[in-house]
Amino acid sequence: HYMGLKTGLPTSKLTQKLEQNEFKLSSLLEITKAINNNVPIQTILKIFEYIIREQLGISKLILYTNNQVKWDCILHFGSRGLNKKINVDKELSHIQEITVIESSSIETLNSFDVVIPIIHKKNPIAYLLIGDLEEELFNISPGLKHMPFIQTLASIIVVAIENKRFSNEILEQEINNKEMELAGEMQKLLFPVDLPSNQQLDVAARYESKHLVGG
């Protein structure tokens, strides 16, 4: 083989590396473009699934995210119902970095090859389990060397989900505040400032948001 200039790599290896980098870059661009265009999360997850399944040839995956209350499985394929059997808090929360599962005392985890945590501000916000990696896939390309790339892609998606949820919460709060403000104005228009008050009659007016009283 002719050696690539300065790299010491044969041209075939160099071409392969360039192709891999091009694939990674285009995948990142596709995901970030979808997020910036405010594409629904389910559609973004479909793009992610296509990249992992069709382009990287990985046939088993589970993605859990934390919605502040509990762990949710937001994507799974090839998992044969295992996504419902794994207790994330008990079985995964100690994992802080990309971990190869060679053999685990937890039976459900033995069905997978790699656990990829998504850490944000030192806290795990998601876990990705990948399995059914072929031997050659596992050792060479696109096996373990692609795991940091998969972690980056998943991280971008999960942080986007967090941001969307946070934005929705803020929007809901703003709508509620506006409703209270408007109700206050309506109250001033509908009721006199001084309502009658004596021993026989005591009238007061106040507004309660339907969101706060469960109406």
Where are these regions (language model features)?
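Signal-transmission/dimerization alpha-helices at domain junctions
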Residues: H1-T11, E136, P148-E172
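Signal-transmission linkers at sensory-effector interfaces
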Residues: H1-N37
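… and, occasionally, acidic/histidine-rich disordered N-termini of signaling adaptors
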Residues: L171-G215
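Amphipathic alpha-helical coiled-coil segments that mediate homodimerization
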Residues: S27-I35, P40-L56, L63, A183-M186, ...
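A short, aliphatic-rich beta-strand micro-motif
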Residues: S105, N110-H120, A126
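Regulatory loop-to-helix N-cap segments in sensory/regulatory domains
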Residues: I125-L153
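GAF sensory/regulatory domain recognition
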Residues: E49-R53, K60-K90
